[in-house]
Amino acid sequence: MTGRERILTVLKGEIPDRVPVGLFVQEEYLGWFFPEKEQVDRVMDAVECARILGFDLLTRDRKFEVPHFMKKSFGNWDVNEKIKKDKGMLYRATEITTPDGVLKQVEAGPYEERTVSGIHFSTVEYLIENERDLEIFNKFVPRIDSETISEMKERAAFSRELIGELGISAPWGWGGVFNQAATYRNVQELLMDAYLNQEFYQAYMEKMTELIVESNNALTDTDFQCIGIQGNIANAGMVGAEFFDKYILPYEKELAKAIQDAGKFTLYHNCGKARVLQESYVKMGLDMWETVATPPQGDNDLKEAKELIGDSITLSGNLDQVNFLKKAALEEIEKEVTRIMHIGKQGGRYIFAASDFLEKGTPLENVKKVIEVAIREGRY
């Protein structure tokens, strides 16, 4: 089987020739792996990295992670973005002028020129601070435009040709509904809204769902076969199962259903705590959940997760790339990868990977050993 066939077989719930070895590589690792490159690209350079090292590839394109309405102007929606570099940080201030008022968002992230496309911004000033902001947003936020839709189709065709049989592209959309809502409103306020201002919370989440579903409908009407959904903010360290099922699940489920109704797969990302939320992920109707992270990054146990939900959803991850992989001896890696693989491969529905993206500075011989052992031990 090719990497592409292998991954798609697992996502369908069938048994491949071996477990896919789908290591997650993005700008941080790629910039370290290719020190000669002035800038790295998480799709093109991930393809080259996968060819060199011999793993199965799931690229995580970020081209459509930022909504169209935050990138360009429309009628009654004038977007002005300012970028500032200061003391190793990159600040992005977006001011949106409408007939009824101005909305402003300020984000910041660590700046490194070679890996600039991989910056993960944190919001420091929020677009939706109060009910008036939401009224303005709901009234004037533009629908997705034909130019953005054309860009999606072109990018998907480009990715399909570039990746070939190495694997598949699983681009990030804007994120899960709660993730995106928490990007534009302080998460502490958002959590309290669910209890103290339910009408506001419902109106906001319904609008976010409508917009995200519309964008993902466009993403699925392309050559992309799997769509990534970031769900890391509503992790089990932040919310319990009861809160998640009542205030978050209905919206995320609508998004997942829209993607699947288009005949595409869903990849849900929570690289933190998720132990009490695993059954909720099944209720959501997801095809795949990553990263089954163990302590201290998460609170998950692969054997327990396989027994609880492994028949209903594809699991991916579990190898500690922070505290273990960067420091372990080759003999330790052989033992740990073998242990994880023998748990994950049982019954299928497993893609071997780390508990998040590979980190810069990870010894190359360690990564090669992971791939070697995972391929050998993953055969059915």
Protein language model features and the residues they cover:
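Generic detector of solvent-exposed, compositionally biased contiguous segments
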Residues: 1, 57-59, 63-80, 192, ...
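Active-site loop segments of alpha/beta catalytic cores
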Residues: 1-37, 97, 123-380
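Residue-level detector of functionally special positions within alpha-helical transmembrane segments
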Residues: 2, 50, 87-88, 101, ...
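Short alpha-helical segments and helix-capping/turn motifs at coil-helix boundaries
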Residues: 3-8, 43, 76-81, 89-92, ...
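Short secondary-structure boundary micro-motifs
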Residues: 5, 65-68, 77-81, 111, ...
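Segments that shape or occlude catalytic/ligand-binding pockets
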Residues: 32-76
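A contiguous, low-structure linker/loop signature
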Residues: 75-140, 165
